[in-house]
Design a protein with these regions (language model features):
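Intrinsic structural disorder
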Residues: 1-4, 17, 85-88
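Short hydrophobic beta-strand that contains or immediately precedes a catalytic carboxylate
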Residues: 58, 69-73
Length: 188
């Protein structure tokens, strides 16, 4: 081997050592409880007692109206310290057409009012049918949808479908997205 080849091999080895190690979804195991921090990180490939679907499977469910789609992406509130009269433009949320947007319901710990919001909107969307299919999603690598799907299972719904690629996977497949608004808060 020439000196130049030795140098190239050494450089390649150093470069490999400098590359950070990535954790894939397959390496991520399910936690016993809810994820309570670092919500934008690789998620497990599974969710006990839920069906996990690909984009193609989610599309098939959507096209056949086989389930209710629940978007749990958080909603950024108007900043509390914004001076009166300041124009506040919300960032629009584009989600899967026909979805029910229940923001902030995927956090690891929910305030009682947020849990009531989730429960009452699920009851309304499913018409109280605990076996109705419920597809839960957010964005790819977002624990919000995993947490929300786990919580919905814990509420007694038996046909929970987790779509981990969310609107990222949907958009990549060139499927339609529509601007959405959150469901209004319900009375306690």
């Amino acid at each position: 081997m020439t000196a130049m080849m030795h140098r190239a091999v050494r450089c390649a080895l150093v470069a490999l050592l400098c590359v950070p190690t990535c954790v894939s979804a397959q390496d991520q195991s399910e936690p016993a409880g809810y994820r309570t921090e670092d919500y934008r990180a690789p998620t497990p490939a599974t969710l006990k007692d839920a069906r996990v679907v690909t984009t193609a499977e989610a599309e098939q469910i959507w096209r056949t109206s086989g389930a209710i789609f629940i978007d749990v992406l958080p909603h950024a509130p108007r900043p509390a310290n914004l001076p009166p009269g300041t124009i506040w433009r919300e960032k629009p949320r584009r989600n899967i057409p026909g979805s029910v947007w229940l923001p902030d319901t995927g956090y690891g710990a929910l305030a009682p009012v947020t849990e009531h919001y989730l429960r009452s909107n699920l009851a309304r969307a499913t018409q109280g049918e605990m076996t109705k299919g419920i597809v839960v999603y957010c964005l790819r690598d977002c624990w919000m949808s995993w947490n929300a799907a786990k919580r919905i299972l814990g509420m007694g719904y038996s046909n929970v479908i987790w779509y981990p690629d969310g609107t990222d996977g949907w958009a990549e497949a060139d499927l339609p997205l529509r601007e959405s608004t959150p469901e209004p808060p319900s009375s306690p």
